[in-house]
Amino acid sequence: MIRKLTLALLLTLPTIGVAIDLEGFYITPKGGISKSMDTGVTVGDTGGGQFDIKDNDLGTGSVFGLSIGKYITNNFRLELEASQRGGLEYDTEYASEPNLGTTTKADIDTKSIFINGFYDFESFTISSTSVTPYFGGGVGISRNKMGTTTETTPDQVITDLDGNTLSQFSYKLAAGTLVSLTESLSLDINYQYVNLGNFKSGLDYVVVSGGAGSDTLTEALNGGEIKTQELMVGLQYKF
């Protein structure tokens, strides 16, 4: 999705430039490392029985995005950002009977759209290079996909549970620095905390090893919240 959006935006920029004045606008492709935080102790329900699932983080993944923004004043700017996170994995186990010791694994992927606002502080110079610190945040919507969930009991009975995708309210807080490279191009380095909302499994499952059968859960497996700390690097080009 991000690649298609990036290509579409780049192809339409010349046309947009003819139609409107691009002064004050900027574009920022970016990428970075996404380190997840604990999702929280959650409760599973399979056919009427509830049990605790151990607190778990989703490991470390990657994040890529593209922002298009506009300087409203010399210090305040707004932007629309599309981003995608991958490489995260739900990997935990049940912490209570009757499924004590059963492991649960699933790949996690998220796509999000944010509206961000940033305040740029006064610039200062280091070795003839202009540096501009900033802080801000954003709100948006994320599409959180939990892939096929594989559960393995201590007796090696393996069950696959359908994946699911949820739309969730998301928010972020960020602080960073713009390092001027040319009059129009700046290196954008920032740290951000992002809460992407909840993720859950589907309801249908099938036993794939150590037994036979299929059924439907009375309640989806609740994985908890996707919360990440991210270090991002981008290139801001001002028109």
Where are these regions (language model features)?
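Transmembrane beta-barrel strands of outer-membrane/channel proteins
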Residues: P29-K35, L80-Q84, F135-I141, T177, ...
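Residue-level signature of outer-membrane beta-barrel architecture
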Residues: I20, K70, A82, Y119-F121, ...
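Hydrophobic, lipid-facing positions within transmembrane beta-strands of outer-membrane proteins
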Residues: F25, S62-L66, K111-I115, V139, ...
